[in-house]
Amino acid sequence: MAILVVAEHTNAALAAATLNTVAAAQAIGGDIHVLVAGSGCSAAAEAAAKIAGVTKVLVADNAAFAHQLPENVAPLIAELGAGYSHILAAATTNGKNFLPRVAAQLDVDQISEIISVESPDTFKRPIYAGNAIATVQSLSLIHI
């Protein structure tokens, strides 16, 4: 079981949110691969390689990925992600932009803004503006 973590970065540096996402991947268990898609993003890729628990870093360095536009990034993630059991990204503007597209392209459900990993297919997430916590189980082959 391998997990694809989509790195949140500024091309020059990795965002702290990526570390939180890797921690969630560690809670799931399995090999953790980090995708760094950007333009001139070698520094972010090097930082991703130094994160404890990361077994592989995939780099997509192209001008088309410079601004993390979901129209460009989502097809890349969907193509790469088809071979993974989980695809994770931080609940940031970028993650919220491209993950729904990735889920649609792979024809699987998306579980948004998890706060806890209970098992590889069961997660906790806030509902009702954070006033309640729902436990959600996914039967999809790829968990997003």
Give a label for each model feature.
Residues 1-142:
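N-terminal glycine-rich FAD/FM-binding segment characteristic of electron-transfer flavoproteins
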